[in-house]
Amino acid sequence: MLTALDETLHHQGPETFAHVLSTDHRFYDRQLMIGFSPDGKAGFLAGITVFKNMNVVEGFMVAQVHGNKQYNVRFSQPLRPFSDNMQAEVGPMNIDIVRPLQELRVRLAKGDYPIALDMTYEGVIPAGLQEPHTGRLDGRKHSDYMRYHQVGKANGWMEVDGERFEAVDWFAWRDHSWGVRPVVGGFEPFTGTQTAGGVASAAQTGDRGLFLIYFGFSNGVQAGDIQIKEDGSGKRFFLDGEVYNVGGPAIRVVDARHHIEFQPGTRLFATATMELDLANGETWHLKAKPVGKPWAFFGSGMDGGFFDGQGQGVYRSSELLTEVDVYDMSEPEIINMPDGSTRLPKHREQLTVCEINGVEGQAYVPMFVIGKQPRFGLPDR
């Protein structure tokens, strides 16, 4: 199949842009964006993903207001025939590339669901390409993907359950990743080692537990990102980050240290601090405290989401499928589900206020504490 993109001179192999070179069913390509008000009383999480080898395109719009509920809208439909322009779309939701690597617009039209949104994202620092994410378990390559990410600001509006919020320079963050990751497409082969599960990254440590922390941060003057992955004993296997004096060049992070104060009885942080050693000899200090509630990511369809429990990238319907639910987030860590059951998700990503070298700003702080974690004195889970 030919598309307009095939007129360009940017092919990466002997295939058209309608297909991918990998035959792995898990191959994905995702745009994801978050934004939240300075006080954390309102926030959104939005994304669209294409699974070319599963003939599926999915989208999600998740919102929280006043720190007590998470509203979830999920879409899934066949990918083909698909649009070959620069716009990602699924049903009533789309993400437009206004200025590549700088400005995007995400919209969800009003419908028979509790969220409507029109937000324009603009980067405050350049998009940063991470080191490749790769991993094997029992000889099988389970991860092989790329990601770039960017700290920015969001302007526009959001309506949630009839309440309207105007966004003026809300903190925003986005990532775009593509490749192969575990827990996509409905099944993952078992090869001998049981993993802690919960997030795709848990496969990278087998049965040794996972600690992952990421900061995307800005106070308008200084901004940047840092990601660390370690196993449960503290052995580090991934470090990637760079910082900016806004308007200046990137400065690489060469080492980092973290200190976590946990909320009692949970694996959520009350305070997360980082020291970043930079290539220019400086050390930057970050101190984040939660506002709002950490996203329960299965509401987006990831991590065994959707009503069928199969998670992302599964062919579900020959027409547009729409799912809607609302979670009670009033407890610190436990999610009260609409059917009266409870869940304790492993994949949480937190909105925060963050001091950056003593100057207050905001940060987006995913933190996964999965499996055995003896160094933190946490009971096994």
Task: Label the predicted regions.
Residues M1-R381:
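Structured soluble/peripheral alpha/beta segments that form catalytic or ligand/cofactor-binding pockets
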